[in-house]
């Protein structure tokens, strides 16, 4: 016997300056905008639901699903999020300002990233689940939102998410 476990997928669209779709990808864990072939920070604007949030100088940003909260996002200082929560996590990678902290937004949100400042296309890459790498032109936009359909995982009957966390994160067992 198996139990179905629907999980949020992220849809990542890269649009060029004319608004045409240059790339369309899915990610189960995370989408990462990160520096590439440079030792200096990158600079980008973060928009959520069409509203400007901030310009950030950092080594990048991790946009994660609740499933991905136990992966790269956790290593970057993000929270563990229960997998059936309808949320998207945003975690800066080595931000220049100590005020840049991880945040969590509604799963219905649309995240938009735009390069700014001296950051050029040669300075950054976008990686989806550590597998697909995209080049981002300086005048393009990266749009990240929840995919229309979830991933459907199957677990053996009686699956216990917290048991998985105890094993994966080496949490102590229950004291008798």
Which residues does each PLM region occupy?
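Gly/Ser/Thr-rich active-site loops/lids in small-molecule metabolic enzymes
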Residues: 55-59, 63-99
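ATP/nucleoside-binding phosphotransfer catalytic cores, i.e., glycine-rich phosphate-binding loops
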Residues: 33, 49-52, 101-176
